[in-house]
A protein has these predicted regions:
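Conserved aromatic anchor
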Residues: 1-11
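Short beta-strand elements bearing conserved aromatic residues within extracellular beta-rich modules
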Residues: 13-16
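Beta-strand-rich modules
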Residues: 37-63
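Extracellular fibronectin type III
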Residues: 54-82
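Acidic Gly/Asp/Thr-rich repetitive segments characteristic of extracellular carbohydrate-active
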Residues: 81-102, 106-149
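Extracellular beta-strand-rich solenoid/capping regions of secreted or surface-exposed proteins
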Residues: 124-145, 161-185, 194-211, 216-229
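Acidic/polar low-complexity surface segments
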Residues: 155-177, 183, 239-252, 276-282
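Right-handed parallel beta-helix
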Residues: 182-192, 206-217, 229-245, 255-256, ...
Length: 344
């Protein structure tokens, strides 16, 4: 849930309470003409939200505004990512954070310095790890599956990161072996959460969620599910085209959301594909097994091709909107199986 309000004269900041509980200050964002608060981790239901102005001395002022009976709905969890699986990433299926989940706030100024304790060895050996990519890499050791939510605030560029473990794509989320449980959520806060100048490589990972942010000018693919991934949920993203590549068909970068290497149980939903060259490749030539993928409620907006291009995978596509797509819609090729319904 989120709410917006006009600034009150004399207020330097605001506190926001949901059913009497104060939300994290990082969830309150100031824009040119308004403020916005994101209230994350609520289950479906009715809530009372109170916005209290705060003066320059940190004291709460008069003029609080209360909204009663704010109705919160759960995310649509249709699709193969949730098939026989509960709680992708850091959240339960009811929308609440898992009981032991960590929350880390990622901004341009904290991506290098954010830190947390990670189990990195036998007998519960722990160490404090600093930097976004370093924290993700520490999970690759396979000892720690503590759910973790990375909350992206504002614009985070390639130069802001502590490093990238994939020179081709950008941030790498990699499990120790195929289909390793990671329990990670990457989620945007506010109206302007943006990943700029890089994308994501996901490999050997299970239980990863991406939601509510934009990816712009990625290195190669915006989102590459490369090898042996499962239960991956990609939703409510704005996906712009990437940097120009060396090949003739890479004027707008390479792929946008590519799914291959025996990745399975993936849902791509409620995303806006903006003018992409190649929107989504699904499968290569050797996938076998339950490579079941769902695309639903996506908006392919002036994108050129691969909506999706499917090889050797089984895909369900429904309620997608194709607007002025230049080359072709869905491409069914080698060994593919596609069920399409209610697309426009």
């Amino acid at each position: 849930a989120y709410l917006k309000w006009a600034p009150l004269e004399g207020a330097s900041s605001y506190n926001v309470y949901v059913d009497g509980k104060k939300i994290d200050a990082q969830l309150i964002r100031q824009y040119a003409s308004y403020f916005r608060a994101d209230v994350l981790g609520l289950k479906a239901g009715s809530y009372t939200v109170k916005v209290v102005p705060v003066d320059a001395a940190g004291k709460e002022m008069a003029g609080a505004n209360t909204v009663s009976n704010l109705l919160v709905k759960n995310y649509n969890r249709e699709g193969f990512a949730h098939f026989n699986f509960g709680g992708i990433g850091a959240y339960n299926n009811d929308g609440t954070l898992k009981s032991d989940a960590k929350v880390l706030y990622i901004t341009a100024s904290t991506a290098k310095t954010v830190s947390t304790e990670v189990i990195t060895g036998a007998k519960n050996k722990k160490q404090t790890v600093k930097g976004l990519q370093a924290i993700i890499d520490a999970y690759q050791k396979g000892y720690d599956i503590t759910p973790i939510a990375f909350r992206i605030i504002g614009k985070v560029s390639l130069a802001d990161l502590d490093g990238i473990s994939s020179s081709a794509e950008g941030l790498q989320i990699k499990g120790k072996t195929g289909y390793s449980t990671m329990n990670m959520t990457f989620e945007g806060v506010g109206d302007d959460a943006t990943i700029y100048g890089f994308g994501f490589l996901v490999r050997n990972a299970k239980s990863v969620e991406f939601r509510n942010f934009a990816i712009m000018r990625c290195l190669d693919d915006a989102m590459s599910l490369d090898t042996k991934n499962s239960n991956i949920w990609i939703h409510h993203l704005d996906l712009f085209y990437g940097r120009k590549g060396s090949a003739a068909d890479q004027a707008k970068g390479d792929g946008t959301v590519d799914i291959k290497g025996n990745s399975k149980y993936v849902t791509v939903a409620y995303n806006h594909f903006w003018d992409n060259g190649k929107s989504s490749m699904c499968g290569m030539k050797s996938e076998t097994g339950e490579n079941w993928i769902t695309y639903h409620h996506n908006w392919f907006d002036h994108s050129d091709s691969r909506h999706a291009r499917v090889r050797t995978m089984t895909v369900h596509m429904y309620n997608n909107y194709y607007q002025h797509c230049d080359v072709y819609g869905v491409g069914a090729t080698t060994g593919s199986s596609i069920f399409m319904e209610s697309n426009y």
